[in-house]
A protein has these predicted regions:
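Extended alpha-helical targeting/anchoring segments
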Residues: 1-186
């Protein structure tokens, strides 16, 4: 990964690891605890007990919203903790907004998502409509909204195919990063 970054082949790669092992409790209880300790507007739980699999997800990020022929994604990149009081919260927020590295990474992600939506949107319709800090129970994030108008013959499924997987969970440029992740997972 580091060599690819130094060579300029990719700019950022978000790499996760798989964990397998005994939980010691029912996975749905873990999901309920996650929902209490890290409430997020987009959460989900799927269990296939016969396969021994469970998936719990909790995210504040909107990958895709479609409505009346318009598409929107709200990428998140840049994080600070919540403050212990309003003054500290404000200081941490200002630090996040003015951090050059965080802003550069966020801008890179917004550009990636603009490009992805551009694949399925009418020419000239894709634009960034919002840039702000959103506060959640434990952290605050830089969040933007990128919007477009679906091109003729395109629908939400086409938009999902263009955006998936989301740039905030892969990195940039997406095709190179996804190939690198595939190689690392072999």
């Amino acid at each position: 990964i580091k060599n690819s970054i130094v060579a300029g082949e990719l700019y950022q790669l978000n790499f996760g690891r798989t964990w397998q092992g005994p939980l010691g409790e029912d996975p749905v209880n873990i999901f309920h605890r996650l929902a209490i300790n890290n409430p997020a507007p987009f959460s989900g739980y799927i269990e296939a007990a016969d396969l021994g699999l469970a998936l719990a997800s909790s995210s504040p990020e909107i990958l895709l919203e479609t409505k009346n022929g318009e598409v929107m994604t709200a990428p998140i990149k840049g994080t600070r903790p919540r403050g212990s009081d309003p003054d500290q919260e404000s200081l941490l927020r200002r630090d996040l907004v003015h951090d050059k590295k965080e802003r550069a990474e966020h801008r890179m992600l917004v550009d990636l998502e603009r490009n992805d939506l551009g694949i399925v949107s009418k020419p000239g319709s894709v634009h960034q409509s919002r840039f702000d800090v959103e506060a959640y129970s434990n952290v605050q994030h830089l969040v933007s909204q990128v919007r477009g108008v679906l091109d003729d013959g395109k629908d939400g499924i086409d938009a999902l195919q263009a955006l998936f997987p989301g740039g905030s969970i892969t990195g940039c440029p997406k095709t190179v990063v996804c190939a690198a992740i595939d190689e690392l997972e072999q």
